Each structure stands twice: as C-alpha cells, then as structure tokens.
Amino acid sequence: MMPLLLLAAASTDLDALDQAVARCDRHAANPVFAGEAARRSQFLLDAYREQEAIVADRLALADQRRAVREAGPVKASDQKQFDLQAAALEDRQKALNDKRMLEGIRQDAMDTMRRYFLTNCPAGKAIGK
C-alpha cells in the first residue's frame, strides 16, 4: 500500500506545481524548482544502493547454487529455495526499474514545467496575470 501512497503524493505534487506554473505563482513554484537538484541526487543515491544490494544478493545466490552443485546432487527442496530467492530478486529488480521509469517521467515533467515557467512568467510579473 505504501508505494501507491507515494505515487499518489508525487502525482498530487506535480498537479499542484502545474497549477502554480499556469498561474505564474513564483512563491509556490520556486521552492519546488530550487529543491529539484537535491531530490534528484537523493533518488540516484537510493537507486544505486538498491541496485548494488540486488547485485550483491544475486552473486551470493550464485555462490550458494555453485556450492550445492559441487557438493553433489541438488535436492528438490534446495532447488525450490533457490528458485524462490531468484524470484524475489527479480521482483526487486522490476520494482526498481519501475521506480526509475517513473522518476524519469517525473523529471521530464519538472523540466518541461520549469522551461514553460521561465519562458512565460517573466520576473516581476504579478501572480495570476
């Protein structure tokens, strides 16, 4: 449920920013644009850490499989456990890929709104005009 709440919050934030940009509301838009670089950096760090953890877990799983194969015939229970671990890793990778895709779309939207704002809302223009 938590990822759905985060998606809804991000969508709401973009909607609010879009409305502020349409009104040339500098008081609402400028803080969002100013915080964007830090937000992007944090997202990249978080995505890197998660990808690094997935890779480490994949390597550990491969080492476990190799050790079991070298010890002799693989038991069905061991194979099932390996399959479950591999499926969990695949789910984590898909979730990370989805987050990266959504973040890319969000960044494109932010960049487009910022360009529109800079082009159509000259400094000193009254709010809503």
Task: Indicate where each model-derived feature is located.
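Immediate post-signal-peptide N-terminus of mature secreted/exported proteins
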Residues: A10-L59
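Low-complexity, intrinsically disordered short peptide segments enriched in small/polar/basic residues
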Residues: D18, A29-N30, R40-Q42, Q51-E52, ...
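Mid-chain, structured segments of secreted extracytoplasmic proteins
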Residues: A53-L102
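Sec-dependent N-terminal signal peptides
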Residues: M1-A10
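Prokaryotic Sec-type signal peptides and long signal-anchor helices
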Residues: A37, A47, A86, N120-C121
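C-terminal amphipathic alpha-helix
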Residues: V21-V32, A88-K129
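Generic alpha-helical structural signal
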Residues: L6, F43-L44, E50, D78, ...
